[in-house]
Amino acid sequence: MIILTKLNGEKFMLNPDLIEIVTENPDTVITTSTGHSYIVEQSMNEILSLIKEYRLSVRRQRLE
């Protein structure tokens, strides 16, 4: 799970495997495969980094 922040400051966790589309114009909007949309403070690049970190941690756990 990755931790994101809504524009109102509320933090929430999202399963990155559910992310279908991320747009940035100018607000960053995440749309999931379930049809939910979230407007977040993080940039598209920050979200990409969070997803990469999450996937690396999952792979490390499998190797242990």
Per-region residue spans from a language model:
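Eukaryotic intrinsically disordered, low-complexity regulatory linkers and tails enriched in Ser/Thr/Pro
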Residues: 1-13, 17-64
